[in-house]
């Protein structure tokens, strides 16, 4: 695709690329249908990685509710409208974004590919798509930012240590983040049977904690821990325990030999598990963050209209309606079902982003029609990464943009700004 085609007619340009390659006998390595994409990704991942990435909480009914919510709404296409030129761009926090799509934060991407955080940064940046760097990345935010030519935000898990929170925000600002996305729904880890039945939590292996081990405040906390007398029983020596020790040791900054001698990697993992989340986080904590950054602050995980109103009262700049892809609370409402109530409560005063359950362009268009300013996507591009690395992630995003463009035009709508609730009906 040429740069002009990507932004003015991405659907037709993407189709042309695929069909022309097909005429020479080449087929897309990245499946364009959701079921085939999921199946190909599962084949490409280890059982542990697949369980962690694809799994959700409990019976996974919230994950299903996310999908069911989209299926309950149907587009109502209009005919004989000039849609020869389409505009997918949106305005967010003073920046014009070419597409209404945000790359949502996904942690522990090294389960899929060792360089996955860097790969998705490059893929998103090459398309001008805003990406959100995860607190649970496997590279420091500064390294990820250096790979990303596009706009980026930083996702904050609010630690039990305020000084660490402040350090993360300061680093995010310095590395060029344009917004802070506070994830609210992880005060405790959800009940995830796929991981529990395997006894597998990647953080214990030292995975996904590079933001922490690269942080001066966190490293001080680790040093303070190591200076205290050891407490508790020593881990039982088994082959699995040795593999865990090797895993955390090779991922920790420094040489393997020195890390093994010092015991710092284990102390870092234990410190992370202690400070990662704050179950006591409440509305009264938000001024602390507001006082420490001039960046827009978005709250991710809002589902109830009253929480949306309270967010406005707190001076929050944006809301992300999200169920964490169903990974935290089983039996909860689907994200799209929550969207209209939140949009109504907000009344256009701040942008509302829909995250969770998005499989393709038709889902993007339905969310936009129901009032979302933009749509966050996560698992789909992770699946692309698993299949074909950076190129796989890029192609998933290209396909999503292309389908969004085509569904928009075929529904008789020329611009995202024209989309409204009249474009859909509930069945």
Predicted regions and their residues:
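Charged C-terminal helix
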Residues: 402-427
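A gly/proline- and charged-residue-enriched helix-loop-helix capping module
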Residues: 126-147, 151-165
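Alpha/beta enzyme core
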Residues: 108, 122, 147, 160-354, ...
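Glycine-centered helix-coil hinge/cap
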Residues: 46, 347, 388-389, 420
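Glycine-rich active-site/cofactor-binding loop and its immediate structural neighborhood
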Residues: 97-136
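An N-cap/entry alpha-helix motif that binds or orients negatively charged groups
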Residues: 2-94, 199, 203-208, 215-281, ...
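C-terminal helical cap(s) of enzyme catalytic domains, especially alpha/beta-barrels
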Residues: 66, 197, 335-342, 385-405
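Short, conserved beta-strand segments within well-ordered enzyme catalytic domains
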Residues: 74, 89-91, 100-104, 130-132, ...
């Amino acid at each position: 695709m040429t740069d002009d085609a990507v932004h003015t007619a991405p659907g037709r340009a993407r189709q042309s690329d695929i069909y022309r390659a097909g005429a020479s006998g080449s087929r897309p390595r990245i499946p364009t249908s959701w079921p085939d994409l999921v199946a190909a990704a599962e084949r490409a991942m280890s059982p542990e990685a697949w369980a962690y990435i694809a799994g959700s909480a409990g019976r996974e009914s919230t994950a299903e509710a996310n999908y069911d919510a989209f299926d309950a709404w149907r587009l109502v296409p209009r005919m004989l409208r000039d849609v020869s030129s389409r505009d997918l761009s949106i305005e967010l926090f003073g920046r014009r974004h070419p597409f209404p799509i945000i790359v949502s934060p996904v942690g522990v991407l090294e389960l899929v590919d060792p360089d996955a955080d860097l790969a998705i940064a490059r893929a998103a940046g090459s398309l001008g798509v805003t990406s959100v760097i995860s607190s649970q990345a496997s590279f420091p935010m500064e390294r990820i930012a250096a790979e990303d030519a596009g706009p980026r935000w930083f996702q904050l898990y609010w630690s039990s240590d305020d000084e660490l929170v402040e350090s993360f925000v300061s680093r995010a600002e310095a590395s060029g983040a344009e917004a802070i996305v506070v994830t609210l729904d992880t005060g405790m880890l959800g009940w995830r049977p796929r991981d529990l039945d395997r006894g597998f939590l990647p953080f214990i292996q030292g995975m996904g904690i590079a933001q922490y081990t690269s942080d001066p405040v966190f490293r001080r906390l680790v040093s303070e821990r190591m200076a205290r007398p050891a407490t508790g029983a020593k881990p039982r020596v088994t082959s699995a325990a040795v593999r865990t020790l090797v895993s955390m040791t090779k991922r920790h900054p420094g040489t393997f030999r020195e890390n093994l001698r010092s015991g710092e990697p284990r102390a870092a993992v234990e410190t992370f598990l202690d400070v990662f989340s704050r179950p006591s986080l409440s509305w009264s904590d938000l001024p602390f963050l507001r006082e420490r950054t001039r960046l827009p602050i978005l709250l991710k995980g809002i589902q109830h209209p009253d929480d949306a109103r309270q967010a406005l009262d707190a001076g929050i700049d944006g809301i992300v309606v999200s169920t964490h892809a169903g990974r935290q609370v089983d039996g909860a409402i689907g994200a799209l079902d929550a969207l209209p109530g939140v949009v109504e409560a907000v009344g256009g005063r701040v942008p509302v982003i829909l995250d969770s359950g998005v499989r393709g362009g038709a889902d993007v268009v339905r969310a936009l029609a129901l009032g979302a300013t933009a749509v966050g996507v996560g698992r789909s591009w992770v699946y692309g990464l698993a299949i074909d690395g950076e190129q796989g992630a890029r192609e998933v995003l290209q396909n999503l943009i292309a389908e969004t463009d085509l569904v928009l035009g075929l529904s008789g709508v020329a611009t995202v700004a024209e989309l409204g609730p009249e474009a859909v009906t509930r069945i």
